[in-house]
Amino acid sequence: MSGKIEHIVLLVALFAVLPLSAKKPQQASISAEQEQQFKYYWYAARQAITDERYAEAYTLLEFCRWIKPNDGTTLYQLGIVQQSLGHADQARECFEQAYKAQPKGTASENLLEQLKRIYMSNSEWEKALKMQDEIDDRTEYDAYSALTRYRIYAMWGKTKDAIKAIDTYLEHDPTDLRFLLFRLELLEQTGAKKKELYAMYDRILELDPRNLMVLNNYAYHMATHGGDLKEAERMSGITIREEPNNPVYLDTYGWILHLQQQDDLAKFYLKKALWNAKDATKEEIIKHLEAIK
């Protein structure tokens, strides 16, 4: 109860020093008294945010904005509060105002991250990249930056740029399996040429010989594109020994056996795959079974 009374007294005191007829003061003409008021309400707002009293924090920060309408830090904190209150559009407006209020090249990394996430969630890819560029100007280029660029370009549908973002990072760390797998995924999705695709499979397996997903995909592609069926069977065999009930691996192994005219054994593995498959993965297995006479 005492907390509520204190808050009411605070607001009454605030209205007493801010007459309703007054215009918003300009930051250049802030008096010492107004500066003291600003600091008081600012720290009260910060405490309210810490205590998750966001509605109260919003009121206090609005009064801070009344005193300093172009204060970037206040606008940023208002954006955080609006987010916490579930007001996405208002939060975006506050963050963008905070960005514009600060001299070029001085926006905080936290503000840039907030704007980048908002732009990415709204498919505003150019704006998101601009924010990442500014982040990189403040911090050392790293895996997080490369990953962000890869994600933006991939979701934007710019596959070549996504691969370029990955390759740029791999120049710094050529053995990073995460980025090698990202690159492989893009090559698989875009139907890359066999030579380039197989080189990537081999590169990953040199670093991680027991990567079951890569072994499975490599084996399936090799078997279905005129490659060495025995080598495909060998790689696929590793996957089902490691995960004997994995329907995807069983399906691949069964289909490779079928391509080698071992249909009875192929049916055994395909039926086992179907038995272990969830509904979403059954269609391809059924097609393979129906193809075997």
Feature map (PLM): residue ranges:
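Start-of-helix register in tetratricopeptide repeats
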Residues: 39, 73, 107-110, 144, ...
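Residue-level recognition of tetratricopeptide repeat
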Residues: 46, 80, 117, 151, ...
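Register position in tetratricopeptide repeats
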Residues: 50-51, 84-85, 117-122, 155-156, ...
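Canonical tetratricopeptide repeat
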Residues: 77, 111-114, 148, 182, ...
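Short coil turns that delineate tetratricopeptide repeat
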Residues: 69, 103-106, 140, 174, ...
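Conserved structural position within tetratricopeptide repeats
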Residues: 63-66, 99-103, 133-137, 170-171, ...
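N-terminal leader/linker segments that initiate helical-solenoid repeat arrays
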Residues: 17-73, 84, 89, 93, ...
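Single-residue signature of alpha-solenoid repeat helices
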Residues: 57, 91, 128, 162, ...
